[in-house]
Amino acid sequence: MIKILADDRIPFVSELFGDFGELILKPGAHIQNRDLLAVNALLTRSITSVDSALLEGTAVEFVGSATAGFDHIDSTWLKKQSIHWAYAPGANATAVAEYVLHCVAYLHKKNLLPRKSATAAIIGVGHVGCVVSDRLRKIGFTVFHNDPPRAQLEKDFISVPLASLANVDLVCLHTPLVKTGNFPTYHLIDNRFLKMLKPGSVLLNAGRGAVIDNNALLQCDHVITCLDVWENEPTVNLQLLEKTTIATPHIAGYSKQAKLRATLMIYDAFLKYFHLSDTRRFSELQQLQETMTLNIQDGRNAEDILLTLFDPGRESQRMRETLAENPDQFEYLRRHFPLRNEFSAIQLTPTPSALLRKELDDWGFK
């Protein structure tokens, strides 16, 4: 019998993994080495550091992380110990891209971003960056890409140098955090880059906090800042928080569908590793995810609908007020943040007019 220990915040973990052996649920922040001594499979999230301190001397042979990144996993050590591991790359790509669209809608409403002839730069064009690029193009942006590692691997990929991005209206960061090698991203956005940006440009980071030198950003007064990730989080620089136009607690990828997608990806890896057969069909799981019905009032446009679903301005104010009162509440805000529905799971009533339908299609509603 397989013994499985899982983070209790992984959606549908009991429904998917409960039939394959003994399943133990525990908060990810409290998982310790002694919990894993007789455990064969560990299912976790980014809140748990997976390294020698956690796994040395345990029976763990498979690690599945229901996350799009693996900064919290010491993959080198796991490989040396012949411990198989899997994660969920791209699971949250749609959710992050739609977070960016919510921010764009909010910035449009505040007249902080042009609606016509707007330009955007995507720095880091992987799973998430590709989707963000596609969605921005569909609402009229001219999009430039910066991803030197990808350009080195793909001869047809065009990576625009950072120095050529001075005049774009929107800069979106979607790189992993890399501190070594030929293409480090730690403090990629530094004082020099920030000074280069034109006044009134928007800098949006929904990737990794330390890709931006937050101290340099604190001294930058000519750029509109939208941050979902923060250097040194869960500790947030409160002065920087006050300067941001949009501030959220690392929740850009928080959608119901993204969470389910991530669970299914590690579920598939688990089945493959242990040579097991699927006991659930994806269609059955989809039925567990209820769609959301939104009533469209007269006169609403697509941006109004986006901001009804998720208003970055309102959430930013809530974060500022909460952390001003208690700076240690970042993880609490993140843990208890309500999951959004992706646009594909939203039903609009009554049926939109042909004009609104076209507008909604451009923004990604189907």
Curated annotation (Swiss-Prot):
Gene: pdxB
Species the sequence originates in: Coxiella burnetii (strain RSA 331 / Henzerling II)
Main location: cytoplasm
The reaction(s) this protein catalyses: 4-phospho-D-erythronate + NAD(+) = (R)-3-hydroxy-2-oxo-4-phosphooxybutanoate + NADH + H(+)
GO molecular function annotations of the record: 4-phosphoerythronate dehydrogenase activity; glyoxylate reductase (NADPH) activity; hydroxypyruvate reductase [NAD(P)H] activity; NAD binding; protein dimerization activity
Name of the protein described by the UniProt record: Erythronate-4-phosphate dehydrogenase
Cellular component, GO annotation: cytosol
Role according to the record: Catalyzes the oxidation of erythronate-4-phosphate to 3-hydroxy-2-oxo-4-phosphonooxybutanoate.
Entry binding sites for NAD(+): D147, T175, D228, G253
Pathway the protein acts in: Cofactor biosynthesis; pyridoxine 5'-phosphate biosynthesis; pyridoxine 5'-phosphate from D-erythrose 4-phosphate: step 2/5
